[in-house]
Amino acid sequence: MIKLSNITKVFHQGTRTIQALNNVSLHVPAGQIYGVIGASGAGKSTLIRCVNLLERPTEGSVLVDGQELTTLSESELTKARRQIGMIFQHFNLLSSRTVFGNVALPLELDNTPKDEIKRRVTELLSLVGLGDKHDSYPSNLSGGQKQRVAIARALASNPKVLLCDEATSALDPATTRSILELLKDINRRLGLTILLITHEMDVVKRICDCVAVISNGELIEQDTVSEVFSHPKTPLAQKFIQSTLHLDIPEDYQERLQAEPFTDCVPMLRLEFTGQSVDAPLLSETARRFNVNNNIISAQMDYAGGVKFGIMLTEMHGTQQDTQAAIAWLQEHHVKVEVLGYV
């Protein structure tokens, strides 16, 4: 549905040249929810704006539903953009128009008959859960409701693609979850292809099928969400994953934790489990095999891309030889082990 090939984007600011994107290629199959994650300034907003040519690439090809957008005339591009809806971090609603009027605007600009506008807007407001807000004004809506209006407006022309530019970053966690569930529901009901950009791995984990990691204008890793979570190939991907699978060391342990071993100390471990290792009784097995005892301090389990993930903080009690053997055995069984220090 979306195919970006060798996209490069260069900005000129006076005598300065800024390369925002460098030879980026990305394929989003029809019906998928695809996430692009990166830090601020990585190039993700420029990338998503190249899809509908709000930013025209310096080099490269942009195919949407089999149509090459970079070669179209302005009138042809305007027509093609009707198949590409877009929502933003800021909702950009017209304060002088009601909810109905905001959603109706793109249909009015397209000279859609009034009866069809009424039918379509009513249908969309019901879809986004705002069937009772036809006559409300944006000033009377919550942030989540405003974003729902923006989503309905983006769907007014019945697009095949929806672009989401940090669409939840201005919302609180509970509202973010509700908007993500709405996007997932729309994807499922309408078969809509969704490309979203974010700096939050929680967003990717919750709804995306695939994810690409962008850094300094380049895609450094891309795969299914489950594969990236299970086997991250780059330090940046690992960092994003750790930000969503995170356990804080309790304060009393932080006060006692030391970087180097000392007499009668035990190692504190951070264990990450993925796939089959999540449900396997691996800690019990280490106790039997290596004569070690594990004192679990805290643990958390979650899902990403349909795959279960777990994280645990534990003290491993035993001789140095036994604990080293137990750690090596856990690593052989696909558990990521990090020695945080000694207590």
Curated annotation (Swiss-Prot):
Its EC number is 7.4.2.11. It comes from the Bacteria. Its main location: membrane. Residues 2-241 form the ABC transporter domain. GO terms for molecular function: ABC-type D-methionine transporter activity; ATP binding; ATP hydrolysis activity. It catalyses: L-methionine(out) + ATP + H2O = L-methionine(in) + ADP + phosphate + H(+); D-methionine(out) + ATP + H2O = D-methionine(in) + ADP + phosphate + H(+). The keyword ATP-binding applies. GO terms for cellular component: Gram-negative-bacterium-type cell wall; plasma membrane. It is found in: Cell inner membrane. It is a peripheral membrane protein. ATP binds at residues 38-45. Keywords: Amino-acid transport, ATP-binding, Cell inner membrane, Cell membrane, Membrane, Nucleotide-binding, Translocase, Transport. The complex is composed of two ATP-binding proteins (MetN), two transmembrane proteins (MetI) and a solute-binding protein (MetQ). Part of the ABC transporter complex MetNIQ involved in methionine import. Responsible for energy coupling to the transport system. Belongs to the ABC transporter superfamily. Methionine importer (TC 3.A.1.24) family. This is Methionine import ATP-binding protein MetN. It comes from Escherichia coli O6:H1 (strain CFT073 / ATCC 700928 / UPEC).
